[in-house]
């Protein structure tokens, strides 16, 4: 049975209200990213303890750490960034989640990221080393302007690094917004499917700017993707990130009413295609 999760910072800035909201919507997982307006990577020990208690008190589990790892340019120093990744590993262990969401770097200013393949692979390999001994894996999200902007490049990362510690988070809307693809299930999904363990539910209309669509109403083929998951008897997490008020490089906003509408739409679409969804 597939499981719903959410970037609940799109609902409200208050973390207590985030977990209350998800519990009320009967969404059993959360993907923490911004907690009381602070990135999860920047929280103090006391703030982390408080967040963990709220999650536990409302009966939620963590689908992945919503980290911004990999959203830096390749000409920035790597060691401080690797240290941040090691902290993300500690956070995953602390929040008892198997995954860290991450990205595959931007090119130096004015350069083409596809020309930096070797450097990307070296950094990914270094992060695999940092995962040694932890029951945690990276899930790389396809996104515009990073090396993994295309399905082929995402698969290339997994094939080249060749480790079960590196898998993919599939975001259909990012192919619409960044690659101008409106048939991602036909042309992107088959390429990435062998490595996908995590799904982002976000829909988009081609040319819509920085505002997403209610799932099923854009060009992201959400219903078709859910049908693919149903055929696989998928039991992973589908993380809601609808961006129905605005979206940006490091997050977005939706608000409670629109978020509830998005959740209802996904549940309805899942039922239509026979995807068991909790």
Located regions from the model:
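Histidine-acidic metal/acid-base catalytic patches
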Residues: 1-8, 12-28, 52, 56-59, ...
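Hydrophobic pocket-lining residues that define ligand/cofactor binding sites across diverse proteins
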Residues: 22, 89-92, 131, 229
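Structural motif corresponding to the early beta-alpha repeats
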Residues: 28, 32-125, 133, 137, ...
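Histidine/acidic residue-rich metal-binding segments in metalloenzymes
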Residues: 123-129, 159-161
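Aromatic-lined carbohydrate-recognition surfaces of secreted/lumenal glycan-active proteins
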Residues: 139-147, 170
